[in-house]
Structure formats: structure tokens, C-alpha cells
Curated annotation (Swiss-Prot), chain A:
Role: Catalyzes the condensation of carbamoyl phosphate and aspartate to form carbamoyl aspartate and inorganic phosphate, the committed step in the de novo pyrimidine nucleotide biosynthesis pathway.
InterPro entries cross-referenced by the UniProt entry: Asp/Orn_carbamoyltranf_P-bd, Asp/Orn_carbamoylTrfase, Asp/Orn_carbamoylTrfase_sf, Asp_carbamoyltransf, Asp_carbamoyltransf_Asp/Orn-bd
Classification lineage: Archaea, Methanobacteriati, Methanobacteriota, Thermococci, Thermococcales
Gene: pyrB
The protein's enzyme class: transferase
Binding site for carbamoyl phosphate: 57-58, 107, 135, 138, 268-269
Name this polypeptide is given: Aspartate carbamoyltransferase catalytic subunit
Source organism, top-level taxon: Archaea
Biological process terms in GO annotation: 'de novo' pyrimidine nucleobase biosynthetic process; 'de novo' UMP biosynthetic process; amino acid metabolic process
One Gene Ontology term of the molecular function aspect: amino acid binding
Its EC number(s): 2.1.3.2
Protein residues bound to L-aspartate: 86, 168, 229
Reactions performed catalytically: carbamoyl phosphate + L-aspartate = N-carbamoyl-L-aspartate + phosphate + H(+)
Family, per entry: Belongs to the aspartate/ornithine carbamoyltransferase superfamily. ATCase family.
UniProt pathway: Pyrimidine metabolism; UMP biosynthesis via de novo pathway; (S)-dihydroorotate from bicarbonate: step 2/3
UniProtKB/Swiss-Prot annotation, chain B:
Record's keyword terms, sorted: Metal-binding, Pyrimidine biosynthesis, Zinc
Domain of life: Archaea
Species classification: Archaea, Methanobacteriati, Methanobacteriota, Thermococci, Thermococcales
Name the record gives this protein: Aspartate carbamoyltransferase regulatory chain
Cellular component per GO, a single term: aspartate carbamoyltransferase complex
Signal peptide: none
Gene (name only): pyrI
Family: Belongs to the PyrI family.
Function per UniProt: Involved in allosteric regulation of aspartate carbamoyltransferase.
InterPro entries the UniProt entry points to: Asp_carbamoyltransf_reg_N, Asp_carbamoylTrfase_reg, Asp_carbamoyltrfase_reg_C, Asp_carbatrfase_reg_C_sf, Asp_carbatrfase_reg_N_sf
GO molecular function, one term: metal ion binding
């Protein structure tokens, strides 16, 4: 598929080949960035970052990626500082911003907003999160992180832990992992299990899946443990939440019987699902994961701008 | 079979076997209330039917609806059959079929979907016809039969 001018909206639009192109381009750009510091691929190009909802990592890493590529950035970090506050429609905002820029990155609280923006704009649009729907660049950087650590994604045993019912990150990641030969362990409280239709779809695609509520029973098997936040408001009462919370905290004790090669990931922000004492172990790679957001987003920007 | 209480048409389309009570919705979806050719539109409601118990029938005078047009009503009237009439005779007969893509008729049931806030024509992909299941092109959420009917 032609990359120049392409929109990046949903991981559903990606084939395995597309994913591989992004990962190999990111690897190449990371290497060049280390050698040269500053790159020139996007010189003279302007990225507009439209964040209708707050974000730390996604916005800053996109901006950092564009600067590293030699391009420049305009945009807003919250809707209240734009004409949206005066009641301007998303359609009109996009139509306006595309006159000023070469590529748009958008985060919006409404699901489907990025798809609509992409249809309105003639320039490429990248989804940086639309409500609880999709966040494809997170999935790509997660895959990049796994590949970088292990040299391959195939053959790994990967555990997803936490809120598997509502978490958009784990849904997209699971869908993308179905392209690879991995065993997936879904670890969550009963209340927050991955929706049945997603599990069925993954099984139909030939994925081997183990569902469990007990982290301690499976953690010894895993190569990757992908931790996500369990939100208090998902539970009917606080007592139930507290009961669950304790048994899903990753700490030094639970890491006593794990494989030496186990790697722990987290999309961040975390609250207390990973104890800070884990940070200094060789298992923790969540801050490396943050770093990887930059080369992956550089790759996407360079590809859709058609400059690489 | 007792004779129908509405007159036969010479040329046009008869949509038969519409579930009782959905006839008006069929007229609305096909935009038949604004027929520009001057022909009449006849609606019979709550007619006894062997197949359905009770049914609605819509007769459109002077207009031949294509399969593609009629398929738009598949969501409200999956049992409907369509007869093309020329010179009082049925010259063509077909059943409605759920299309692959549904545009504009259905509202997304996800209250947080952008289509419920912005000026945009909705679009859904049919991922299963039986049981009926569709996915919103925008928010990617799926809806099943009950929710679909509630959002027509």
C-alpha cells in the first residue's frame, strides 16, 4: 500500500506487512538519530498537533519526533485554547488547520473523531487516541518495544494484565499480536475480562489463548507481562476494588519465580499497579517503551509525508 | 384469498410482507412521501397474512424500485418481498437482502460516537447477516439486532 498521504486511524486498517514496514523504518531512524543527532527528512514540513484532550507522552513524543526529523510543529494542547470553545465544529477546525500544515495528529474525546477528521482533510491524519476506541501508535510502539527486546515477536508468551474489558490499548495490542505466532495470557479480575467477541475473533485467527484470574499461576511462564491500570470506578463498591487491587500489583515478591528474560511493559501513566521497587530490576522496560514512542512516531510521520 | 381493500396498480412496485407496523417506516426510508412523478403511494396496514399473521403492504405507482434501493429497508423489513408490476402483472419478484454497507439510515447507538455530534452521514459495515451485526465505520463499535432496531 502507498504510504504517502495515508491516514493512520485504526490498527484494523493495518496488514502485517504494514506493521513490519513501520517497525523497520523506526529501527532505521533510531539508528540514524543516534549517529547524526538531528535528521533532515521533514525539513520544511509542518505538523499540527490537535489535542482536544490532555496527554503527556503522546503529544510530546509526536512533537519530539517531528523536531528530530527536522520539521516544525504548531497546535494546541487543550480544546479550551482554540475556537472549539466558541462552538466550532471538528469539520471546520480540520478544514482550517490543514491550510497551515502538512500532517495532522489528533486526539479527541469522541470515538470516531479521527476517522471523520481524515475524511475531511486532504492531508494525512494520524490518530493519537479517539475516546475509548483506538490508539494505533501506542500499539505500534508496543510491538516495536517487544521486537527490540527479543529480536522477534514470534514464539513469545505474552501476558496482558489488568482491565481487559475497557482498555483500548490491550484490545488493539491483542489484535495486532494475532498477526504473530504468540501465546496470549489474559489475566484479569472476572469483572474486567476481555470481551468475548474479541477473544473469539482472536481464537478464530488461530491464536492460542489462556484466560485466568490468577497472576501468580502464570507469571512464571511469561516472556512479556503487559500491565495496565485497573480503575476504581469500574467496580460497584470500594471493598471489591480493594480486594482485587492487591492481587494484581507487580512487586518484587511476585517476581521471585519469573523467567530471567521476563520483560514488564506498561503504557503509562501508572498508579500503583507496578511498585516503584520494580523499576530498577532488569525486567522493567516501561521507560524504554516511552523512548520507543519517538522513533515509531518518526517513522509514521516520515512515511505518511512521503519523505523516506 | 380475500381481495385487498386497496386497489391494484397498473405500473409500479409492490412491497409485500412488511412486518405489521413497519409500513410507514418503509415509506420514510425510501423517501416515498415525496414522490415526484405524481403517482400515488398506497399503504395497507395490519393485513392478515398466512406467513406473518399480520403484515403491511406498500404500493408505489409509476415507480420501479431497484433491488439496491429496496435493500435499504432490509433492516426494518427483512421479510419483505418486492413485486415489479407492469400492466397489472407481476413481471419481476425479489426478496430484500441486507446490504454489505448501510449508509445514512441508522444512527450509531454509541452515545460517545462522533456521528452523534457532527454533521456526518453514518456508515456501518454488516459483519454478520444472521444474526444481524454491524460495525460503525467511525467509532468501530458493533451493534446487534435489538440495538439496531432501536436506532433506526
Amino acid at each position: 500500500m502507498e504510504w504517502k498521504g495515508r491516514d493512520v486511524i485504526s490498527i484494523r486498517d493495518f496488514s502485517k506487512e504494514d506493521i513490519e514496514v513501520v517497525l523497520s523504518t523506526a529501527e532505521r531512524l533510531e539508528k540514524e538519530m543516534k549517529e547524526k543527532g538531528q535528521l533532515e527528512y521533514a525539513k520544511g514540513k509542518i505538523l499540527a498537533t490537535l489535542f482536544f484532550e490532555p496527554s503527556t507522552r503522546t503529544r510530546l513524543s509526536f512533537e519530539s519526533a517531528m523536531h528530530r526529523l527536522g520539521g516544525s510543529v504548531i497546535g494546541f494542547a487543550e480544546a479550551s485554547t482554540s475556537s472549539v470553545k466558541k462552538g466550532e465544529s471538528l469539520r471546520d477546525t480540520i478544514k482550517t488547520v490543514e491550510q497551515y500544515s502538512d500532517v495532522i495528529v489528533i486526539r479527541h474525546p469522541k470515538e470516531g473523531a479521527a476517522r471523520l477528521a481524515a475524511e475531511v482533510a486532504d492531508i494525512p491524519v494520524i490518530n493519537a487516541g479517539d475516546g475509548s476506541n483506538q490508539h494505533p501508535t501506542q500499539t505500534l510502539l508496543d510491538l516495536y518495544t517487544i521486537k527490540k527486546e527479543f529480536g522477534t515477536i514470534d514464539g513469545l508468551k505474552i501476558g496482558l494484565l489488568g482491565d481487559l474489558k475497557y482498555g483500548r490499548t490491550v484490545h488493539s495490542l491483542a489484535e495486532a499480536l494475532a498477526f504473530y505466532d504468540v501465546e496470549l495470557y489474559l489475566i484479569s479480575p472476572e469483572l474486567l475480562r476481555m470481551p468475548k467477541h474479541i477473544v473469539e475473533e482472536l481464537r478464530e485467527r488461530g491464536m492460542k489463548i489462556v484466560e485466568t484470574t490468577k497472576l501468580e499461576e502464570v507469571i512464571g511462564e511469561l516472556d512479556v507481562l503487559y500491565v495496565t491500570r485497573i480503575q476504581k470506578e469500574r467496580f460497584p463498591d470500594e471493598q471489591e476494588y480493594l480486594k482485587v487491587k492487591g492481587s494484581y500489583q507487580v512487586n518484587l515478591k511476585i517476581l521471585e519465580n519469573v523467567k530471567d528474560s521476563l520483560r514488564i511493559m506498561h503504557p503509562l501513566p501508572r498508579v500503583d499497579e507496578i511498585h516503584p521497587e520494580v523499576d530498577k530490576t532488569k525486567h522493567a522496560i516501561y521507560f524504554k517503551q516511552v523512548f520507543n514512542g519517538v522513533p515509531v512516531r518518526m517513522a509514521l510521520l516520515a512515511l505518511v509525508l512521503g519523505v523516506i | 384469498m380475500p381481495e385487498l381493500k386497496v386497489s391494484a396498480i397498473k405500473e409500479g412496485t409492490v412491497i409485500d410482507h412488511i412486518p405489521a407496523g413497519k409500513g410507514l417506516k418503509v415509506i420514510e426510508i425510501l423517501g416515498l412521501s415525496k414522490l415526484s412523478n405524481g403517482g400515488s403511494v398506497l399503504l395497507a396496514m395490519n393485513v392478515p397474512s398466512k406467513k406473518l399473521g399480520r403484515k403491511d403492504i406498500v404500493k408505489v405507482e409509476g415507480k420501479f424500485l431497484s433491488e439496491e434501493e429496496v435493500n435499504k429497508i432490509a433492516l426494518v423489513a427483512p421479510t419483505a418481498t418486492v413485486n415489479i408490476i407492469r400492466n397489472y402483472k407481476v413481471v419481476e419478484k425479489f426478496k430484500v437482502e441486507v446490504p454489505e454497507v448501510i449508509e445514512g439510515i441508522l444512527k450509531c447507538g454509541n452515545p460517545n460516537c462522533i456521528t452523534n455530534y457532527e454533521y456526518v452521514t453514518t456508515k456501518f459495515y454488516v459483519i454478520s447477516k444472521n444474526p444481524l451485526k454491524v460495525r460503525c465505520h467511525y467509532c468501530e463499535r458493533t451493534m446487534e439486532e435489538e440495538e439496531i432496531l432501536a436506532n433506526l
